[in-house]
Amino acid sequence: MSVKIRLKRMGSKKRPFYRIVVADSRSPRDGRFITSLGTYNPLTTPKQVKFDEDAVMEWLQKGAQPSDTVRNMLQKAGVMKKYHEAKYAKK
């Protein structure tokens, strides 16, 4: 089972709101997911992104692959840098 960290669209027509979720890569965009990690609201200025950093790190270490959009959000928040430092740290 390939697991992805991606966005699930919520909200109403023309008023999108997204949840950052962990889901099986074969499930549909707005379908079943394993767990919710945070939210993303593109309508606010500045765009509002909230997520549980510890849970995201845990899923990345388990092998979950972030989508391109989620990867960019995590890079801006500094999570991807922490993940790579932890992954390639000298032991």
From Swiss-Prot:
Instruction: Give the Pfam families listed for this entry.
Output: Ribosomal_S16 (PF00886)
What the entry lists under InterPro entries is as follows:
Ribosomal_bS16, Ribosomal_bS16_dom_sf
> Family per UniProt?
Belongs to the bacterial ribosomal protein bS16 family.
Q: Which organism is it from?
A: Limosilactobacillus fermentum (strain NBRC 3956 / LMG 18251) (Lactobacillus fermentum)
Keywords annotated in UniProt: Ribonucleoprotein, Ribosomal protein
The GO cellular component terms are: cytoplasm; small ribosomal subunit
Query: SUPFAM superfamilies per the record?
Result: Ribosomal protein S16
Single GO MF annotation: structural constituent of ribosome
Which terms under GO biological process does the entry name?
translation
Name-wise, this protein is: Small ribosomal subunit protein bS16
Q: Which domain of life is it from?
A: Bacteria
